[in-house]
Amino acid sequence: PMNPYLATLLTFAIAIASHYLSDAIPHWDYPLQSIENPEDKENRKWGSGRSALIKDISSMAVDGFLGVGIVLAVVRPVTAQEWIWVIAAIVGGCLPDFLQGLYMFRLKFLRPHQWLHDIFHSNIRLGPYPLFGIPFQLIIAVIALYILM
């Protein structure tokens, strides 16, 4: 059997890699109202509108909790080690987007991450086409759930 520490680290690394690979697939992103210059990769940042920021953070929180709930419902960890692996996968899978959010505070040390994120992220934006983008993402989610099971 694999060393549990190594397995946890591998789970975390695979989750990060799967996030970047998934970003390469054209997908729908819900619009964030609190971002200034959303189409300009170099100059986009969080805006100063407090109510828009609260709304966006609320949307992201619901999105995150829903995703975690679905993962827990499918994987159903029982042992402590299973819980650790699932948490490592969740944190690793969410980390790239979290770091992108921090980057929009103009944190220069995150430039290498943003560069990597931009390389992997598809340039095909399905934001204006939710009737295509959302079903496409649902198909990808079903395939991912099938693999998990």
Question: What do the PLM-derived regions correspond to, one by one?
Answer:
Residues 1-149:
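N-terminal membrane-targeting hydrophobic helices
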